[in-house]
């Protein structure tokens, strides 16, 4: 049977996937940067599965959209649609370590218990003011603008704090019309603002010295190693697609540095 997607740049088509407008906006914003396909093995470009009961199975589709550019080692979107069980967009921009840039991260998740939504420009080296100062000075006004309109998502685990900025926008919303309205009126414009700021920082970024690049690379490796070990989607993906596929996906695609 012919694969549904042949390239990491092929469109993600999943009917009723609620996060499609977010991915579409991000892809359009990247067009001026002339994205090229990022190497993703065929078994991770699109995978079908089932969840639910034998009498009432629910179709699961997991897709990966990915690219690279002059300054981005990897841009990737992990996209999951499983009907009432889950709808997910995990969108991360990994810059080359030769540029003094944070990661861009958006985690948009709908589960039967509600929406879990997070946006951030995540530092590679939290304790390094040279790395964080210019980012946080511009990020915090955007964060303050949108956080007052959202309920707080809850505390961040102590071990995770080094991997987030003070502008980590994190909320939990109830399912239903009120949550949908907040997604449309707050989360979507906040997503655009965070991404616009990030792309402005990218445009200004210049290559750093080899010594600085090595330090940034070490920070990126720590971040991606932590994310790979603590990925909260691991249990869900394993339930949908099996343990072996999930571990390979996490370590060879999502956090592959």
Curated annotation (Swiss-Prot):
Organism for this UniProt entry: Prochlorococcus marinus (strain MIT 9303)
InterPro entries linked: Ferredoxin-dep_bilin_Rdtase, Phycoerythrobilin_Fdx_Rdtase
MF (Gene Ontology): cobalt ion binding; phycoerythrobilin:ferredoxin oxidoreductase activity
PANTHER family: PHYTOCHROMOBILIN:FERREDOXIN OXIDOREDUCTASE, CHLOROPLASTIC
Family: Belongs to the HY2 family.
Keywords: Oxidoreductase
Function recorded in the entry: Catalyzes the two-electron reduction of the C2 and C3(1) diene system of 15,16-dihydrobiliverdin.
EC number of this enzyme: 1.3.7.3
Catalysed reactions listed for this entry: (3Z)-phycoerythrobilin + oxidized 2[4Fe-4S]-[ferredoxin] = 15,16-dihydrobiliverdin + reduced 2[4Fe-4S]-[ferredoxin] + 2 H(+)
Species lineage: Bacteria, Bacillati, Cyanobacteriota, Cyanophyceae, Synechococcales
Cross-referenced Pfam families: Fe_bilin_red
Protein known as: Phycoerythrobilin:ferredoxin oxidoreductase
Primary gene name: pebB
């Amino acid at each position: 049977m012919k694969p549904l997607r042949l390239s990491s740049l092929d469109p993600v088509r999943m009917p009723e996937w609620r996060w499609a407008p977010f991915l579409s906006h991000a892809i359009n914003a990247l067009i001026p940067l002339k994205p090229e396909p990022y190497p993703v093995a065929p078994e991770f470009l699109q995978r079908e599965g089932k969840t639910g009961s034998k009498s009432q199975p629910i179709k699961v589709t997991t897709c990966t959209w990915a690219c690279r550019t002059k300054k981005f080692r990897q841009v990737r979107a992990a996209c999951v649609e499983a009907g009432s069980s889950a709808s997910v967009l995990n969108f991360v921009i990994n810059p080359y370590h030769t540029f003094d840039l944070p990661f861009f991260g958006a985690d948009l998740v709908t589960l039967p218990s509600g929406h879990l939504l997070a946006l951030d420009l995540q530092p590679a080296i939290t304790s390094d003011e040279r790395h964080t100062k210019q980012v946080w000075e511009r990020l915090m006004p955007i964060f303050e603008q949108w956080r007052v309109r959202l309920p707080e998502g809850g505390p961040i685990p102590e071990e995770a704090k080094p991997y987030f900025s003070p502008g980590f926008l994190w909320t939990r919303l109830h399912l239903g019309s009120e949550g949908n309205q907040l997604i449309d009126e707050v989360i979507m414009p906040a997503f655009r603002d965070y991404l616009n700021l990030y792309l402005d920082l990218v445009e200004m970024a210049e290559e750093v010295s080899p010594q600085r690049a090595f330090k940034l690379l070490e920070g990126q490796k720590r971040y991606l190693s932590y994310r790979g070990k603590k990925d909260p989607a691991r249990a869900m993906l394993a339930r949908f697609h099996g343990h072996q596929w999930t571990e390979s996906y996490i370590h060879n695609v999502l956090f592959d540095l």
